[in-house]
């Protein structure tokens, strides 16, 4: 425990970013950590919280939510990820075009119209012709609907992946009570110990 206390009360003479391990001359208030765990470059921390693997935008030690501002990249600078594209989008779009073309051709076919208007055409033949048109038409409508849903999902997923979180400092809270400082220090030391040493059995 003495090691943890020394780490919490570490001097800021040799300031070093805890992410890149490079020199850091300015200590900003991004969370409620103290000591060397508070020393970090803004660029390093922003790059860290913008990675896909980081889902929780809060400090891993003190669990303080970062003050981040969400922005979207310009549409011309979006990066599209192939894994975000749903497989059905690649299947439904060509299917919609192919079946739609067949349905359109069937609808405007002169020969079919003539057969439908002919008195010699049996009722069974007319039913078959109507069914042969309605079948592809229904498939076309369903495929188009599914394609629209997949396109919307792909757009929202791509937009989320092209989101930039800009980091800002926390606002000073002058209303905190000094009576809870001892408890906060103890919880903070336990959190640092668990991250560095590992959870106790």
Curated annotation (Swiss-Prot):
Keywords: Host endosome, Host Golgi apparatus, Host membrane, Host-virus interaction, Inhibition of host adaptive immune response by virus, Inhibition of host MHC class I molecule presentation by virus, Membrane, Metal-binding, Modulation of host ubiquitin pathway by viral E3 ligase, Modulation of host ubiquitin pathway by virus, Transferase, Transmembrane, Transmembrane helix, Ubl conjugation pathway, Viral immunoevasion, Zinc, Zinc-finger
One BP term from GO: symbiont-mediated perturbation of host ubiquitin-like protein modification
Transmembrane segments: 93-113, 124-144
Residue ranges annotated as Lumenal topological domain: 114-123
Residues annotated to bind Zn(2+) 2: 31, 33, 59, 62
Signal peptide interval: none
Side of membrane Cytoplasmic, spans: 1-92, 145-201
Residue numbers spanned by region Disordered: 168-188
Pfam families: RINGv
Subcellular location, record wording: Host membrane; Host Golgi apparatus, Host trans-Golgi network membrane; Host early endosome membrane
GO molecular function: transferase activity; zinc ion binding
Chain sites annotated for binding Zn(2+) 1: 17, 20, 41, 44
Zinc finger RING-CH-type: from-to: 9-69
E.C. number: 2.3.2.27
Biased composition regions of type Acidic residues, renumbered to the chain: 169-188
InterPro entries linked to this entry: Znf_RING-CH, Znf_RING/FYVE/PHD
Highest taxon listed in the record's lineage: Viruses
Comment on protein domains: The RING-CH-type zinc finger domain is required for E3 ligase activity.
Family note: Belongs to the poxviridae LAP protein family.
Record-given protein name: E3 ubiquitin-protein ligase LAP
Organism: Rabbit fibroma virus (strain Kasza)
């Amino acid at each position: 425990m003495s090691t943890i206390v020394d780490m919490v009360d570490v001097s800021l003479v040799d300031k070093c970013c805890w992410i890149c391990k490079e020199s850091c001359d300015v200590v900003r208030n991004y969370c409620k950590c103290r000591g060397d765990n508070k020393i970090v470059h803004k660029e390093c921390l922003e790059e860290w919280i913008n990675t896909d693997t980081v889902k929780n935008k809060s400090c891993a030690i003190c669990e303080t939510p970062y003050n981040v501002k969400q922005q979207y990249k310009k549409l011309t600078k979006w990066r599209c990820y192939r894994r975000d594209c749903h497989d059905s989008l690649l299947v439904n779009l060509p299917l919609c075009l192919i079946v739609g073309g067949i349905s359109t051709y069937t609808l405007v076919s002169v020969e079919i119209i003539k057969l439908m208007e002919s008195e010699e055409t049996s009722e069974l033949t007319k039913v078959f012709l109507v069914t042969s048109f309605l079948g592809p038409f229904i498939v076309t409508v369903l495929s188009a609907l599914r394609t629209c849903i997949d396109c919307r999902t792909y757009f929202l997923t791509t937009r989320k992946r092209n989101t930039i979180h800009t980091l800002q400092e926390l606002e000073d809270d002058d209303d905190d009570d000094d009576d809870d400082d001892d408890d906060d220090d103890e919880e903070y030391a336990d959190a640092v110990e668990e991250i560095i040493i590992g959870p106790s059995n």
